Regions:
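Active-site-proximal beta-strand elements of phosphoester/diester hydrolases
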Residues: 2-10, 114-120, 239-240
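Acidic, His/Gly-rich catalytic cores of divalent-metal-dependent hydrolytic chemistry
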Residues: 131-267
Length: 267
């Protein structure tokens, strides 16, 4: 049995299938874990969603910002943008079944010694705290008041963690850390404006670049940051978003041996 973690799929269904064939993925014996953003921007989000759901217990995922965006649109609290490619899902006969299934997933998964998140874990949280805070958001997603969560999900403030935060501000910041973060200060103040670079001006650094971050001894697998192109980010860090949606390959990581496999459809 092999556990595979795949980076951002974003509706690139053909590349996903090609990649799984390349590693000889067998859903009867292997597991596929997605590091978030399985939908949006690519041409086949509906096919991707249906396929992942069809894998049953052989599939797990953490939610990314695009997955949450789809759910917010479906709830009627957000309108699609011109860049979104979610129309087919929203109009599908099985839309509600797919959306309900998607909404059940967490923001953080532990698979053996590996922790999978979409964007990262801020430097001021250790793994135990991250797990507890991820569960707070998951509880909101699973509650009958989940529409309230989506109504207040969007926004860049507050931008720094304070344990006394409550309500929608608290949930928004936790969600932003797990699904949108790239750069932050040493104490975790977010810069959500800088999206396309791999460097930032003082006092900001990549979240994983802070040497004293409290999760440094944990093996963290993440996606989200296509500009990194899957670069080596340091010990215990595994970046899987290789920018498939932008013309790069799609990447999968074998958790049994930490080997990467990339796949790209030739033009």
């Amino acid at each position: 049995m092999t556990d595979y973690v795949v980076g951002d799929i974003q509706g690139c269904f053909d590349e996903l299938i090609g990649l799984l064939k390349k590693v000889r993925f067998n859903p009867d014996t292997d597991n596929l874990i997605a590091a978030g953003d399985i939908v949006n921007r690519g041409p086949k989000s509906l096919e991707t969603l249906r396929f992942c759901k069809s894998l049953g217990k052989s599939f797990q995922m953490v939610l990314g910002n695009h997955d949450l965006h789809l759910l917010a649109i479906a709830k009627g609290v957000k309108s699609p943008t011109s860049k979104d490619t979610l129309h087919d899902i929203l109009k599908a006969s099985d839309a509600q079944i797919l959306l309900d299934w998607l909404q059940q997933h967490p923001l953080l998964l532990n698979i053996g010694e590996y922790t999978i998140v979409h964007a990262g874990i801020p430097p001021q949280w250790d793994l135990n705290q991250a797990e507890l805070l991820a569960k707070e958001v998951q509880s909101a997603l699973l509650s009958e008041q989940s529409g309230e969560f989506f109504t207040h999900m969007y926004g860049n403030e507050p931008s720094i963690w304070d344990s006394t935060l409550k309500g929608t501000d608290r949930l928004r910041l936790i969600t932003n850390y797990f699904t949108r973060m790239r750069f932050c200060t040493e104490v975790g103040q977010l810069d959500l404006q800088n999206k396309n670079s791999i460097s930032a001006n003082f006092p900001y650094k990549a979240w994983f670049a802070w040497g004293d971050r409290r999760s440094a001894k944990s093996k963290i697998v993440f996606g989200h940051w296509a500009a990194l192109k899957g670069m080596n980010c340091g010990e215990n860090l595994f970046a899987l978003d290789t920018g498939c949606i932008w013309g790069g390959p799609m990447r999968v990581m074998n958790l049994n041996n930490e080997e990467y496999t990339d796949y790209k459809i030739s033009p």
